[in-house]
Amino acid sequence: MSRSLELIVAGFVRLNDRDALHDILSHRQDLLRQLVSVTGVDPRQAIAQVSQEITIVEAGLATLAPE
């Protein structure tokens, strides 16, 4: 998924669509909060994946000009 997300983020950066990037970031942060509270299964791999995706989105946001 990370490569797909990299391409999506790159597209939104190219379009200068800060709102879409913030929406993706919020979704991933919510997902991470849910994964951390999961019991009965080992969510470490999913947590690592979502954390990596958050880093990708944050990097994309950092490349946009400040508002």
Question: What function would you assign to each model-found segment?
Answer:
Residues 23-67:
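Short, charge-rich amphipathic interface segments used for partner binding and complex assembly
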Residues 1-37:
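N-terminal acidic leader/helix
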